[in-house]
Amino acid sequence: MKFELNGKIIFSKEITDDAKKDIIEVLNDRTILLKGVPTGKEEEASKIVNYEFKGNELILNIISGTYARAHEAIIRLKKPIMEKVGKIHKMGIRDIKIDNYEITINAPHNIDALENLKVPECETELNEEENTIKIIFKNIGDSELKRNIVDRAIKFVKTEIDNIGDSGEECDLTYEVCGIAPNTIVSEYKAERTISYNKDPTEESEKLGWVKRFSGKGQWFYTPPMTKLLRAFEELLMEECINKIGFDECLFPKLIPLEVMYKMRYLEGLPEGMYYVSPPKRDPEMFKEFVNEMMIKNEIPIHKLKDLLRNPGYVLAPAQCEPFYQFFDHELVDIDNPVKFVDKSGWTYRWEGGGSKGLDRVHEFLRIETVQMGAPEFVNSVRDDTLKYAEKLAEKLDLEYWTEVGDDPFYLEGRKKEERNIEFPEVPKYEMRLWLPHVKDERKGVAVTSANVHGTHFVEGFGVKDYKNRTVWTGCTGFGLSRWVIGFLAQYGFDYNDWPELIKDKIGEMPNIPKVITWPKK
């Protein structure tokens, strides 16, 4: 790497000739910039190429290689200069400013894959002939340097370079971590009966009035028949899977502070997949203007509403297990007394963009979430049990399924690099899918159970420790109620008489849809 800096140290008053002599003495002392540089790497250290005095400013041109980088050098000069001139000349340093700072980083291959790379706080230039990327900072001061934005930008770019494989495609952290190739099928079950139903369950649900599209994107109103079926599956999953493993029920918050998502590193991986929440300002007078304009114009004045909202401070829970890790934030635990919690208290939210179509991929969905914390062996065992009992339930219902190694564990999704010393499991995620026979072009399934082990990912992020300093892992399993129902209806259809006794016993008598003249449309 090459670093070239043009900046200045700004003093509290004009620099006198005597002060200049003392400052020059400091600038000529190479030991200041060689401190900490390994023997034999002196040429990589910072060098002051040029300097000049102008009023109360010391203008510097500094170059360096990897060691004692130029931006570190200008900060390093501050203390010895002050020791030399502070008391004697009664002057202080007011600020450090970098007017222009160019950092050239070598990229071994496929530099064109970074063509659209954007780095916050700086500009980028690609040189495809030399396979280098240059990041350029302009007009940054002491406060930015103290926040280490330069080092973070360098680290960010180097990570992006490392993530570009020989093919020029981005590498995914999931594929790097997995001991078994993602999408490998590890178990499957073929239905014993002949599955003849082949209609789209979303379309049929709408025709029958079991659901109605809500005005929000990816949202549905579930009417009594669909709700009855959802609750039946909720009971079955609790009885046949979760209670057998001994989870204790909790009520998890669903409004999650952004700082929790930051510690989870969810904001790195899938920031575009969440609903962000902005609390309102508590100013009745300002809202009175909003209401008045709405009543006069007979429309919602969105522009005015934006001004009445604070910055986003929360997200609607996209993973459901977020509060579990915050609960243990910086706590001492005992892995001899592991924890198993389950939450089924409300909706989960994902922004799917254009990916939301039918009932199998929605923005607002119900699921049962189990979470466990303990020794690695315990966490793996519990995860495997949740999957085993889910598969057994599907077999009891004669639902055709397969289980595969997941290619998108939620805590790794969208992430390209892990710079911390994290322990990962051999398989971060198993995904169980129910077959959708109405999809003709391919053998497609709906993911109904996602069984995850996180290793030390969340333990590290939330500072959780065992009181004997033993290894602590976490894991979670999500049972998607809506998706279990869709997979069931896709294979059995909507005729109650064709359903298995296990389901009919839970439901009893099916309720009717509300009588509305204009709905459902025939």
Curated annotation (Swiss-Prot):
It is found in: Cytoplasm. Its main location: cytoplasm. Its EC number is 6.1.1.11. GO terms for cellular component: cytoplasm. InterPro entries: aa-tRNA-synt_IIb, aa-tRNA-synth_II/BPL/LPL, Ser-tRNA-ligase_2_arc, SerS_tRNA-bd. SUPFAM superfamilies: Class II aaRS and biotin synthetases. L-serine binds at residues 319, 350, 367-369. Zn(2+) binds at residues 321, 369, 476. Binds 1 Zn(2+) ion per subunit. This ion is coordinated with 2 cysteines, 1 glutamate and a water molecule that dissociates from the zinc ion to allow the coordination of the amino group of the serine substrate, which is essential for catalysis. Pathway: Aminoacyl-tRNA biosynthesis; selenocysteinyl-tRNA(Sec) biosynthesis; L-seryl-tRNA(Sec) from L-serine and tRNA(Sec): step 1/1. ATP binds at residues 350-352, 361-362, 483. Catalyzes the attachment of serine to tRNA(Ser). Is also able to aminoacylate tRNA(Sec) with serine, to form the misacylated tRNA L-seryl-tRNA(Sec), which will be further converted into selenocysteinyl-tRNA(Sec). Belongs to the class-II aminoacyl-tRNA synthetase family. Type-2 seryl-tRNA synthetase subfamily. Consists of two distinct domains, a catalytic core and a N-terminal extension that is presumably involved in tRNA binding. This is Type-2 serine--tRNA ligase. It comes from Methanococcus aeolicus (strain ATCC BAA-1280 / DSM 17508 / OCM 812 / Nankai-3).
